[in-house]
């Protein structure tokens, strides 16, 4: 049985992220790929992370925030990764959040209301 824990793969490089993901495969429920890792390693990197942890769900923490049309386009661009969970920023509003949820019906959409650290902004 896996623990309902998500490991944040905020690693310095893809190799380290894959090693960390593999280490928790079957133990933790999710691996979390954030914006920095996604932009650095791209969809192919995320696919490598998924392959390293095939028993973990993919939590894609991109915090999408734009007009609804653009959010849908961004969500569709990651659809091939089959994220189990995708984050959007709550400030995008109901229309944006609902549009992403409709565009990716197999993905849970979580709205982030406050960033972890506002002091660094």
Task: Please name every model-derived segment.
Residues 2, 66-121:
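Conserved anion-binding
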Residues 11-14, 37-39, 91-94:
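Short beta->alpha connector loops
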Residues 17, 42, 46, 93-97:
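Short, well-ordered alpha-helical microsegments
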Residues 12-23, 68-77:
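Short, acidic/polar
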Residues 25, 46-53, 97, 101-105:
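Surface-exposed amphipathic alpha-helices with a cationic face
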Residues 32-85:
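Metabolite-binding pocket within alpha/beta catalytic cores that recognizes anionic/polar moieties
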Residues 3-9, 31-33, 58-62, 86-88, ...:
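Hydrophobic faces of well-ordered beta-strands that scaffold small-molecule active sites
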